[in-house]
């Protein structure tokens, strides 16, 4: 029953007070089970059918799908339940206590993005779900801030095919229809150590890596020349050499050298295509030094994403907001949800607040976000 729901600000407060940090470091990583239970209970109170899905390969993480109505199509509203870790020394407030000051709601996850679920629940007070002609789905995922394992697993296993989806990441209520992807790799070269007084008795991994870097930089130039997407501020795929380490002493031939790099592909480029381009670039080194060069993923890759600009979802949201869709450089779960249906990224709060100390969401977003959620539900589930 709707009258069982706490007030909007109390829902928000409870979400922020329930830690759900995602981290690759096990000591910092937390289960999102308590947060999922909170959400599940609230959506059940509204009459939704709720499924909780354990996410394999995680440390006790879960997805939640709340649904009302049956049949084909409908609308999916999605978001992630986890936050990044916080630096206690840089926060001036308790990250897990929602505080309001000077038109801002402070707390870890206020903008990115646990607060989005408070907006959905509050908006549903004014929606008569019994009159929906198409189903409404609410998806809460796990581990977006690390591996995106929740969205990946949901997209791989669900049979749902809504008409469209909106992911409520903080975009300042500016609709986003495309973003670049991200792949990160470790290039490792195994040489052969020896005393520097006799270089011929060893194989210097740093020298081999120098050769490999030359080929990687040529790939960077080729990506810039070959691929263009003018809507992006940087209208081509970028390649960055981010970290390198090799050797342990000035008088030893370096036995091992490792380079960490990333590529940010534009929409339309497949991960297989990128892996092929990287392997082709490094082929001369691999062929000259068989078995000494390896390429490994540092993190699960994220493809680029694009919603067709002429899709009904884009047209409807642009009309409702009076704003054109944008493209951005950061990554979201959209590439995985997009495999199910056309998807937009659109939510309250600023991306500039994501992962920042004293994270906040401006209260000016409360009314328009609530109204927007009601409008999109009416349009895609009542018509």
From Swiss-Prot:
Keyword annotations from UniProtKB, A to Z: Amino-acid biosynthesis, Arginine biosynthesis, Cobalt, Cytoplasm, Hydrolase, Metal-binding, Zinc
Coiled coil, from the record: none
SUPFAM superfamilies xrefs: Bacterial exopeptidase dimerisation domain, Zn-dependent exopeptidases
Protein name listed in UniProt: Acetylornithine deacetylase
Broadest EC class assigned to this enzyme: hydrolase
Primary location recorded for the protein, binned into one broad class: cytoplasm
Gene name of the encoded protein: argE
Reactions listed under catalytic activity: N(2)-acetyl-L-ornithine + H2O = L-ornithine + acetate
Mitochondrion is among the record's keywords: no
Active site: 82, 144
Function field: Catalyzes the hydrolysis of the amide bond of N(2)-acetylated L-amino acids. Cleaves the acetyl group from N-acetyl-L-ornithine to form L-ornithine, an intermediate in L-arginine biosynthesis pathway, and a branchpoint in the synthesis of polyamines.
Compartment(s) of residence: Cytoplasm
């Amino acid at each position: 029953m709707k009258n069982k729901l706490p007030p909007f600000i109390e829902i928000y407060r409870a979400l922020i007070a329930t830690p759900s940090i995602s981290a690759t470091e096990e000591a910092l990583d937390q289960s999102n089970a308590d947060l999922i239970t909170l959400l599940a209970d609230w959506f059940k109170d509204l009459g939704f059918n709720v499924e909780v899905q354990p996410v394999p390969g995680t440390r006790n993480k879960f997805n939640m799908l709340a649904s009302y109505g049956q049949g084909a199509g409908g609308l999916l509203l999605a978001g992630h339940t986890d936050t990044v870790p916080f630096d206690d020394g840089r926060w001036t407030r308790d990250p897990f206590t929602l505080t309001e000051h000077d038109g801002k709601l402070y707390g870890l996850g206020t903008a990115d993005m646990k607060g989005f679920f408070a907006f959905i629940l509050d908006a549903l007070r004014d929606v008569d779900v019994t009159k929906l002609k198409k189903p409404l789905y609410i998806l809460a995922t796990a581990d977006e801030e690390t591996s995106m394992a929740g969205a990946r697993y949901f997209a791989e296993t669900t049979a749902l095919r809504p008409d469209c989806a909106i992911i409520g990441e903080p975009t300042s209520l500016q609709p986003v229809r495309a973003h670049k992807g991200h792949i990160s790799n470790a290039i490792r070269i195994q040489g052969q150590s020896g005393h520097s007084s006799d270089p011929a008795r060893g194989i210097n991994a740093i020298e081999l890596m120098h050769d490999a870097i030359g080929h990687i930089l040529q790939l960077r130039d080729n990506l810039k020349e070959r691929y263009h997407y003018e809507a992006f501020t940087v209208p081509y795929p970028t390649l960055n050499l981010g970290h390198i380490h090799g050797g342990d002493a000035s008088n030893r031939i370096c036995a091992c050298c490792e380079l960490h790099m990333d590529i940010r592909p534009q929409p339309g480029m497949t991960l297989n295509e990128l892996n092929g381009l990287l392997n082709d670039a490094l082929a001369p080194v691999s062929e000259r030094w068989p078995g000494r060069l390896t390429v490994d993923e540092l993190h699960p890759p994220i493809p680029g994403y694009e919603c067709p600009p002429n899709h009904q979802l884009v047209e409807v949201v642009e009309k409702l907001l009076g704003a054109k869709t944008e493209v951005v450089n950061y990554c979201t779960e959209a590439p995985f949800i997009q495999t199910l249906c056309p998807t937009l990224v659109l939510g309250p709060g600023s991306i500039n607040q994501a992962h920042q100390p004293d994270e906040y969401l401006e209260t000016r977003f409360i009314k328009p976000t609530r109204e927007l959620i009601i409008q999109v539900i009416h349009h895609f589930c009542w018509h």
